[in-house]
Structure formats: C-alpha cells, structure tokens
UniProtKB/Swiss-Prot annotation:
It is a multi-pass membrane protein. Keywords: Cell membrane, Cytochrome c-type biogenesis, Membrane, Sporulation, Transmembrane, Transmembrane helix. The chain crosses the membrane at residues 10-30, 57-77, 87-107, 133-153, 165-185, 204-224. The lineage of its organism: Bacteria, Bacillati, Bacillota, Bacilli, Bacillales. This is Cytochrome c-type biogenesis protein CcdA. GO terms for biological process: cytochrome complex assembly; sporulation resulting in formation of a cellular spore. GO terms for cellular component: plasma membrane. It is found in: Cell membrane. Belongs to the DsbD family. Required for cytochrome c synthesis and stage V of sporulation. Might transfer reducing equivalents across the cytoplasmic membrane, promoting efficient disulfide bond isomerization of proteins localized on the outer surface of the membrane or in the spore coat. Cytochrome c oxidase activity is partially restored by mutations in bdbC or bdbD that are defective in the synthesis of disulfide bond containing proteins. The same mutations abrogate the need for CcdA in sporulation. It comes from Bacillus subtilis (strain 168). The gene is ccdA.
Length: 235
C-alpha cells in the first residue's frame, strides 16, 4: 500500500504545480527569482546559464524546507494516534474524498479558498533571497492547491512514520516540473490549454483513492497485484 501512496503523493505534487492559479504565474515568477526577463528567455535562452539554474534550485530549497518541516510535525502527530489507525484511516479517507469534490469545484468552502501570501516589494538579493522567496511561496500557498496539499497531509497522518517521505515526494512532484520549466519555459501552451481537464482528473482520482482507503480496499488491491506479478506490484 505504501508504494502506491508514494506514487500518488508524487502525483499530488505535480497536480499542485499545474493548478490554474499557479501555472500562469511561473514564467514571470522564474524571471523574478532568476533576474532574467521574458524577452531574454525567448531570444537568448539565458535560463540555461548556471546562475539561473542555481537561483531556481535555491527557490526549491526554500520551498522544500517548509514542507519537510510540516512532514515532521505530521509524523509526530500521527504517532500519537497509532492505536487508532483504522479510525484515522477512515476519517482521512473522508477528508480526501471531500478535497476531491473541492478540487472538482462541486463546492468551495470560503475558509479553505482564502489566499494568504507573503509579498516582496523587492526581491531579496543573492541566492539567499531565492531561498527566502521559496519559503514564502510555500508558506503562502494558493487556494487551488490547498485541497491537494491537505489531502497529502491527511494521507500522511494515517501512516505514522511515513509523513516525511510523503512530503519529500510531494515536494519532488512540484520541483521536477519546475526545474524542467526553467529550461523549457516557452513550451507552456499545452498545459495551459488542458489544465482544467488535468485538475478535474486529479479530483476524480482523489475521490477514488478516498473510497479505496475508507474501505481498506487498497490493501486488497496490493495483495491481488502481488499475486498477479509475483510479489512485485509495479508501482
């Protein structure tokens, strides 16, 4: 079951990356943290330079610090409720289903959809500045990714001791495409065009996973796959 959860957590990071309220901001945001203008990106492709790559990595480092720290807290809380694993699993499953419906846009609770960001009037200087902006971006997060992140945290809470790996994979799911985008920033049209479908598919997947988790069918599926593939699930 853990292998599937790791795969899904990585996918949740990717879904957060392509959320409609974040995706359109990335070209300008990359220009901001790297100091490269959009005209430079289109004409000279300066994002291939080491300076730009280092700034992007520093941003992702700051981003990662927040979520890995959150994972440590989630792991601690989860260990306190180890004796109530089944109840936590079912409550977590219901929350994941709820977040799936929110992602689909079935309803929009105002408290969850409020946006809280830290804004910089001027970019802090140097690579440390990019780290700080990454931390601010993670701490401020945005409404459309809130339900996805909350689902990951809930899933982590049902698996004491696995919260930090979950959060690391969530960060990787966001970081890998972000790094790729820094090299292929002019190739964003396809994702923009299909972002609504991708988010809807993600919402449906969250609901399905929530149902499987609630009835503990995920474990049965893993056992079945193990029987079919000789002990290797393929995930």
């Amino acid at each position: 079951m853990g292998d599937v959860n790791y795969f899904l957590t990585f996918g949740a990071g990717f879904l957060s990356f392509i959320s409609p309220c974040c995706l359109p901001l990335y070209p300008a945001f990359l220009s901001y943290i790297t100091g490269v203008s959009m005209d430079d990106v289109k004409t000279e492709k300066l994002l291939l330079q080491k300076r730009s790559l280092f700034h992007t990595l520093c941003f992702l480092l700051g981003f990662s610090v927040i979520f890995i720290a959150l994972g440590y807290g989630t792991s601690f809380i989860g260990s306190l409720f180890r004796d109530y694993h089944d109840a936590i699993r079912q409550i977590g499953a219901l929350l994941i289903i709820l977040f799936g419906f929110i992602t689909l846009g079935v309803f929009r609770p105002e408290a969850m959809m409020k946006e809280r960001r830290i804004h910089f009037k001027h970019k802090p200087s140097g690579f440390l500045g990019s780290v700080l902006i990454g931390m601010a971006f993670a701490a401020g997060w945005t409404p459309c990714t809130g339900p996805i992140l909350a689902a990951v945290i809930t899933l982590a809470g049902t698996n004491p001791g696995s919260a930090v790996p979950y959060m690391m994979l969530y960060v990787l799911g966001f970081a890998v495409p972000f790094l790729l985008l820094s090299f292929f920033i002019t190739k964003l049209k396809w994702i923009r065009k299909n972002q609504l479908f991708i988010m809807k598919a993600g919402g449906v997947l969250m609901i399905v996973i929530g149902v499987l988790l609630f009835f503990n069918w995920m474990s049965l599926i893993i056992i079945l796959l193990s029987d079919l593939f000789g002990g290797f699930t393929g995930f």
